């Protein structure tokens, strides 16, 4: 997770009656652990960076478990709140992600050793994710909770895979094609297993020479998958070409536009977003709105404009249940998203900051009130 405000990527799913509501919890709001009080109920189960359960939903907070969360570098949690009784947040994706995360070290090791079975295992691990994304229902995707912990390779690969799947769904991919995209995105950085760990984990900015070494990882990834065999060209090209840029200034081959595989063009957007959203030793992470603007600004240069447009229509900036401050001096909670307006949700206001007092709740649709903007996440 990240340390500052507006931290994490989040996915909230508004599910139709045709989809199981397993994992959907009511009465939830997002709270920074630094502001977490005792005697409140955890609304969503919390996992560590190895995918292990730390605190189960329904647990009451205490000084001890709050300290435990801080020790495990958890910075944001969801707690129950009756003011948001009609706002449902789905945590099924967390379980799917956790199950996949547990398998990732074994999958990468087996791939590097040429074990064909590991490729099938990787596909099987993504099946639940693809089934989830392909399910019927309206999907509202917020840029807050894909990334639950500080950046490391396995988390980054899974988050990139999740984002890529949602983009693929927006682009009309069927389930079979989504599975191929998912495996390509999941394995896009497998070539980093051939790069020295001290370079991958360096606590500082890379030198020019070190960056040249790092740039070999797409080629190493292609070699690993070619040696494995049995994977389609689109899957391999997604791994090999994910650092190519739409204008031809990327690497390793300097491809441009449609010469870059569509899988790679999708993965490129997701890879950059998840990478800049992570804290680094040499720079602070981008807030979700900043990372979002970076993707939009790269349209036509770094990224395929048509995919950026799909990105814009697919991902929202502020999560359901987030407490936000508005430019008119009022604060409240995000209760609904507005499609095609990712930074202008519907907010249920509850507090007058200027007067320093609660107010009778009412809702503001920021699409209709263009003179009001979100100025921060509280």
Q: For the regions a protein language model found, what residue spans apply to each?
A:
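Short clusters of hydrophobic/aromatic residues that line enzyme substrate/ligand-binding pockets
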Residues: 46, 199-200, 206, 246-251, ...
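Short, contiguous strand/loop micro-motifs
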Residues: 51-54, 151, 208, 250
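Alpha-helical scaffolding flanking metal-ion-dependent phosphate/phosphodiester catalytic sites
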Residues: 160, 183-194, 212-223, 227-308, ...
């Amino acid at each position: 997770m990240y340390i500052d405000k507006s931290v994490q990527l989040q996915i909230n799913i508004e599910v139709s009656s045709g989809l199981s509501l397993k994992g959907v919890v009511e009465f939830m709001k997002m709270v920074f652990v630094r502001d977490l009080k005792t005697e409140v109920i955890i609304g969503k189960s919390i996992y560590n960076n190895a995918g292990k359960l730390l605190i189960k939903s329904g647990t009451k907070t205490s000084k001890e478990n709050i300290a435990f969360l801080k020790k495990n570098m958890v910075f944001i949690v969801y707690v129950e709140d009756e003011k948001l009784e009609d706002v449902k947040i789905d945590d099924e994706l967390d379980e799917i992600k956790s199950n996949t995360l547990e398998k990732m070290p074994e999958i990468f090791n087996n791939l590097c050793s040429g074990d064909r079975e590991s490729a099938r295992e990787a596909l099987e691990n993504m099946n639940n994710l693809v089934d989830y994304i392909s399910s019927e229902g309206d999907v509202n995707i917020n840029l807050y909770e894909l990334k639950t912990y500080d950046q490391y390779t396995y988390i980054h690969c899974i988050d990139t895979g999740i984002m890529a799947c949602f983009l693929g769904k927006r682009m009309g991919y069927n389930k079979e094609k989504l599975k191929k995209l998912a495996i390509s995105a999941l394995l896009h950085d497998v070539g980093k297993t051939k790069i020295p760990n001290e370079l991958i984990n360096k606590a500082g900015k890379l030198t020019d020479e070190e960056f040249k070494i790092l740039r070999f990882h797409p080629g190493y990834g292609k070699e690993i998958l070619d040696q494995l065999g049995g994977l389609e060209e689109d899957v391999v090209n997604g791994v090999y070409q994910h650092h190519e840029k739409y204008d031809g200034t990327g690497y390793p081959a300097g491809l441009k536009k449609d010469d870059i595989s569509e899988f790679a063009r999708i993965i490129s957007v997701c890879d950059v977003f998840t990478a800049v959203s992570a804290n680094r030793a040499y720079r602070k992470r981008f807030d979700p709105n900043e990372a979002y603007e970076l993707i939009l600004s790269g349209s036509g240069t770094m990224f395929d404009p048509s995919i950026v447009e799909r990105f814009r229509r697919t991902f929202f900036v502020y999560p359901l249940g987030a407490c936000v401050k508005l430019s008119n001096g009022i604060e409240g909670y995000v209760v609904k998203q507005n499609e095609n307006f990712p930074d202008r949700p519907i907010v249920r206001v509850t507090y007058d900051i200027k007067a320093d007092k609660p107010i009778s709740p009412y809702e503001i649709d920021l699409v209709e009130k263009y003179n009001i903007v979100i100025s921060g996440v509280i």
